């Protein structure tokens, strides 16, 4: 069978399994590798990714081909809307075993024994260099995070504490206030700007998760990224919140 790439970025398919009697309809990106696709299917059918064999059936439910190349893209197979992907489980589990979790016996294994197993999720991820085992992807992610931090630090350095500012975030009207905090935080990575708004348009009182970064009334404080803050001559506006 000829295998061709399809242009639509996502596809709606039905998922069935040799372990259960129901079908699920899901949407997936064609840019996933088969190995990555198997990892996502774990949450749908319950089978370990390393124990899956995938079969593709057309919208007419006739067998098309096997998805047997872990490094191939899902979109390189003739997968189209309405197709069915059937998961054959080779873990030794029985039909219906994963349908009622109350019947699943708790299984414990030592870390050392788990590391030696070749059919484990961790072994599958290592073998296919997915997730945290993809050194190149992880290094690229770390480089992007470092570059983002450098850019945020440069932006934050132009925003002095005590200055008047205007905050513009997508989907919200401009809000004015005073810069009360500039720097790193414990609640999320990167540089953040603590704002005391002129009106109760914020989310906190200058503290997050029990740690205080600045003082203000409840609902007057907020933390935003430097990129949405403009410092300048922004006098207080009358929002009409005191009118009866």
Swiss-Prot record:
Function: Binds to alpha-tubulin folding intermediates after their interaction with cytosolic chaperonin in the pathway leading from newly synthesized tubulin to properly folded heterodimer. Involved in regulation of tubulin heterodimer dissociation. May function as a negative regulator of axonal growth.
UniProt family annotation: Belongs to the TBCB family.
GO BP terms in the entry: cell differentiation; cytoplasmic microtubule organization; nervous system development; post-chaperonin tubulin folding pathway; tubulin complex assembly
Transmembrane portions of the chain: none
CAP-Gly domain sequence ranges: 183-225
GO terms for cellular component: cell cortex; cytoplasm; cytosol; microtubule plus-end; nucleus
Species the sequence originates in: Bos taurus
Source lineage: Eukaryota, Metazoa, Chordata, Craniata, Vertebrata
Protein name in UniProt: Tubulin-folding cofactor B
Residue positions, PTM N-acetylmethionine: 1
């Amino acid at each position: 069978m000829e295998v061709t790439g399809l242009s639509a970025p996502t596809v709606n398919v039905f998922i069935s399994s040799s372990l259960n009697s129901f079908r699920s309809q899901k949407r997936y990106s064609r840019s996933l590798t088969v190995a990555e696709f198997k990892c996502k299917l774990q949450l749908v059918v319950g089978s370990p990714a390393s124990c899956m064999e995938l079969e593709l059936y057309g919208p007419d439910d006739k067998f098309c081909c096997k998805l047997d190349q872990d490094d191939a893209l899902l979109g390189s197979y003739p997968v189209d809307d309405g197709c069915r992907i059937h998961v054959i489980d080779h873990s030794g589990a029985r039909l219906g075993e994963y349908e009622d979790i109350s019947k699943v016996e708790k299984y414990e294994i030592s870390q050392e024994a788990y590391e030696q197993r070749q059919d484990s999720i961790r072994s599958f991820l290592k073998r296919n260099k997915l997730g945290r085992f993809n050194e190149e992807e992880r290094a690229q992610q770390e480089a992007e995070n470092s570059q983002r931090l450098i850019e945020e630090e440069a932006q934050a350095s132009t925003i002095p504490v005590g200055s008047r500012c205007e905050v513009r975030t997508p989907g919200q009207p401009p809000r004015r206030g005073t810069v009360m905090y500039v720097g790193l935080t414990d609640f999320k990575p990167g540089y953040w700007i603590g704002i005391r708004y002129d009106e109760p348009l914020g989310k906190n009182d200058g503290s997050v998760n029990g740690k205080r970064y600045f003082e203000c009334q409840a609902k007057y404080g907020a933390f935003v990224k430097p990129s949405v803050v403009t410092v300048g001559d922004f006098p207080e506006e009358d929002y009409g919140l005191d009118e009866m």
